[in-house]
Amino acid sequence: MSTSIQPNAPFRADIVGSFLRPQAVKDARAAYVAGKLDASGLKAVEDDAIRDLVAKQKAAGLQVITDGEFRRSYWHLDFMWGLNGIERRTSRTGYMFHDEETTADTAVVTGPISGENHPFVEHFKFVKALEGEGQVARQTIPAPIQTFSEVTLDRCDGQQESLRAVYKTDEELADAIAAAYRTVIADLYAAGCRNIQFDDCTWGIYCDTDFVAKTGMSPVDLQKVSELGVTLNNAAIADKPDDLVINTHVCRGNYHSTYAFEGGYDPIAPYLFAREDVDAFYLEFDTPRAGGFEPLKYVAPGKKVVLGLVTTKAAELEDEDAIVERIHEAAKYVPLENLYLSPQCGFASCEIGNKLTEDEQWAKIALVKRIAERVWK
């Protein structure tokens, strides 16, 4: 049990994936949207920023590298828009967070969904080429159930009518999404990807018992959507290659240092922790909003848990002793050798990013690294 080189994720000192966008990337994207910069010009700026980011990840001693999600506006929607049969539309409102609303975008089904020629495959190839010795390039994508949830909402006029013109039932839609994901995953694997991460806010919603109650969802309804989440996510990764590690990160919202949902993992643990066929769970535990560690007793034997005990929502550094103590508390439910440490989420799930500086961001990473070396000597 140590922090020495490991062949694949999770790593003792890990990350979720997104990083604060440099101003040059924000400016280039704004110029592109305004028609003042073409696609090749935008890509050149992104390429330079990603090279610099990967160099900083290496310098920080991370074994995993990502592109920081610098080529995206959102952690989830850009992937959905890259699927065949799904298009970008303006929604009536943005997503509602505590004290803040996001920009208004959504995803609409306009034809049969498939995963051929997804742009994220080319994005991954760029990062893969930057891997150093002992490093693993990670591709983050929204979980299949996240895509299902987005396209079945009613966030813009005609969204439901367009969906049902293509898929009459939820079962047909789920099958199509699972198949599309299998295609993208196979293409990523062929491009050399050995670590994929499903980012999943649907479970974070189901943790929020007050929000669930306000929607009128009954316990039976919650059971049905939880069953669907497990079934769809598992269908998307069925028959994956043995050397492809697929993990999942559960989030309660991470926009401009705000959150959307709260509540412990108790309602979802018997489904997510016990039955989802991923290798590891990256879980938020940075505030009391995430509840205690008791639901970890449902984690299937041999599965790994990455404890998100260091927040990305605030610059202040956590007390190292307190984090060490919490790791050992979690070890009452999952063996210490199956526990890992990371920030609770990314630093910029959307372009706007959280309210901290780049230096403060890297100080958080350094803190994770120090604590991991202390716990897993």
Q: Which ranges hold each PLM region?
A:
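Domain-level signal for soluble alpha/beta catalytic cores
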Residues: M1-K377
